């Protein structure tokens, strides 16, 4: 099975990526996670991207806040799918990171999820890998069904409360 390569610009992004890793683990998807900065450790970030295929990564997830150039720097050095997670920083409620992540030049795409969207990044990575993995696709289908059942259970409880 292909792995997901995860990289964050700073350990301050770790709480968001823990949700990513937990979601991947719940779907039995192997992953590898590193802290590499587009600005402070550009060679390591570049090498991580350049070696994505060799390291059996089916896709990459890059999370960063503020200037948030990491996902773009990763995407510039691989043709594997890259998912960007813009992280809330100290100002602008993450809008600076969102715009830095989503506004990529033509030819260097980054699929971008919501600010702090670690769970959706993991689910998108799972969907990318599931294109070539029927067992993973079945696990994703089961998760969707379980999530739907949880919502319907909450609705039933609400209806019971309102109809008393």
Per-region residue spans from a language model:
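Glycine/charged-rich beta-loop-alpha catalytic/anionic-binding loops adjacent to active sites
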Residues: 2, 29-32, 79-81, 102-110
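Glycine-rich phosphate/diphosphate-binding loop of Rossmann-like nucleotide-binding domains
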Residues: 2-40
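C-terminal binding/interaction regions
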Residues: 8-15, 19-20, 95-164
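Short glycine/serine/threonine-rich phosphate/pyrophosphate-binding segments
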Residues: 13-17, 42-45, 64-73, 92-95, ...
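Acidic, glycine/proline-rich low-complexity segments that act as flexible tails and inter-domain linkers
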Residues: 33, 43, 66, 158-164
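N-terminal beta-loop-helix "entrance" segment that forms/cooperates
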Residues: 33-54
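Glycine-rich phosphate-binding loop
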Residues: 48-86
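Glycine/small-residue-rich loop that forms an oxyanion/phosphate-binding "nest" at active or ligand-binding sites
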Residues: 77-106
């Amino acid at each position: 099975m292909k792995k997901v390569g995860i990289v964050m610009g700073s350990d301050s992004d770790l709480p968001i990526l823990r949700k990513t890793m937990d979601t991947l683990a719940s779907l039995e998807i192997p992953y590898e996670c590193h802290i590499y900065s587009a600005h402070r450790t550009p060679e390591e970030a570049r090498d991580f991207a350049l070696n994505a295929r060799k390291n059996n990564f089916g896709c990459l997830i890059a999370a960063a806040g503020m200037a948030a150039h990491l996902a773009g720097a990763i995407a510039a050095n691989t043709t594997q799918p890259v998912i960007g997670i813009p992280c809330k920083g100290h100002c602008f409620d993450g809008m600076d990171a969102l715009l830095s992540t989503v506004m990529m030049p033509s030819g260097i795409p980054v699929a971008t999820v919501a600010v702090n969207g670690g769970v959706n990044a993991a689910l998108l990575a799972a969907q990318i890998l599931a294109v070539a993995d029927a067992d993973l696709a079945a696990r994703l289908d089961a998760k969707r069904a379980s999530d739907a059942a949880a919502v319907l259970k909450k609705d039933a409880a609400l209806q019971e409360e309102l109809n008393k």
